[in-house]
């Protein structure tokens, strides 16, 4: 480093007195000044080099930081894009999950409805089965009662038949009557002869139904008025006097035959 200029060093007190012969010239009497330009130039060059190095280093640092910022920004953008994609995927999954839940809820509701319908149908069938069982039991009971009544009636008819055989034979002889089948188990055909004095071969008959307790007449020859038949049947079903009924039927048939034959 160059030494600075010090005026105190140029004072005369610092030098010995000079003679006139030895006195320096005016130029020689001027102080010797060393500004240190070379050192200053070197120092400026060093400063410039250091400054340029600092600037270059700063520029490189700025470029590196900018590159790092760009890289970080790109990474952040990529991360944001990935997160956005993840969000979209999650939203899609959430929508799918909601749709699945709604579908399962609808299926569950439909299943509950089906179960309720099946339960109602089962209960209805069980109630119907119970009613049918009750009806079957009641029908069976009625059938049993009817069978017992028919058996009792059959026993009664059998006993009555045994008692009435002599009486029936009497009426057959007395009324010129014979009994035949009418083509059905529950019908009998009663045929009368010797009805007309002028035509002993002429016959008349009627079919009697015996399927129930009350008797009924289905056919007659000659044809007898229905009102007259119903009157005779009412008497028979009330008093159960079969012999008297046969006599009345013979009389009705004779009257009908006499009405049809011309008088001479």
UniProtKB/Swiss-Prot annotation:
Residues 59-152 form a coiled coil. CDD domains: RWD_Spc25 (cd23784). It is found in: Nucleus; Chromosome, Centromere, Kinetochore. InterPro entries: Spc25, Spc25_C. GO terms for biological process: cell division; chromosome segregation. The keyword Coiled coil applies. Residues 1-25 are annotated as: Disordered. Keywords: Cell cycle, Cell division, Centromere, Chromosome, Coiled coil, Kinetochore, Mitosis, Nucleus. Residues 1-13 have a biased composition (Polar residues). Acts as a component of the essential kinetochore-associated NDC80 complex, which is required for chromosome segregation and spindle checkpoint activity. Belongs to the SPC25 family. Component of the NDC80 complex, which consists of ndc80, nuf2, spc24 and spc25. This is Probable kinetochore protein spc25. It comes from Aspergillus oryzae (strain ATCC 42149 / RIB 40) (Yellow koji mold). The lineage of its organism: Eukaryota, Fungi, Dikarya, Ascomycota, Pezizomycotina.
């Amino acid at each position: 480093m160059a030494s600075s200029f010090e005026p105190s060093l140029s004072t005369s007190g610092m030098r010995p007195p000079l003679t006139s012969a030895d006195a320096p010239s005016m130029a020689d009497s001027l102080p010797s000044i060393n500004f240190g330009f070379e050192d200053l130039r070197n120092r400026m060059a060093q400063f410039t080099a250091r400054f340029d190095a600092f600037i270059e280093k700063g520029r490189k640092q700025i470029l590196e930081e900018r590159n790092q910022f760009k890289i970080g920004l790109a990474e952040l953008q990529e991360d944001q894009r990935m997160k956005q994609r993840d969000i979209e995927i999650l939203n899609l999954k959430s929508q799918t999950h909601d749709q699945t839940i709604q579908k399962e809820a609808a299926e569950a509701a439909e299943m509950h409805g089906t179960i309720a319908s099946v339960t109602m149908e089962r209960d209805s069938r069980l109630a119907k089965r119970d009613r049918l069982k009750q009806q079957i039991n009641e029908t069976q009971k009625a059938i049993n009662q009817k069978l017992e009544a028919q058996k009792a009636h059959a026993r009664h008819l059998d006993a009555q038949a045994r008692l009435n055989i002599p009486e029936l034979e009497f009426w057959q002889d007395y009324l010129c009557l014979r009994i035949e089948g009418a083509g059905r188990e529950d019908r009998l055909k009663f045929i009368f002869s010797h009805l007309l004095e002028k035509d002993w071969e002429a016959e008349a008959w009627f079919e009697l139904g015996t399927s129930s307790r009350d008797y009924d007449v289905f056919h007659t020859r000659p044809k007898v008025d229905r009102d007259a038949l119903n009157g005779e049947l009412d008497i028979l079903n009330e008093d159960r006097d079969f012999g008297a009924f046969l006599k009345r039927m013979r009389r009705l048939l004779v009257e009908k035959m006499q009405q049809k034959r011309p008088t001479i």
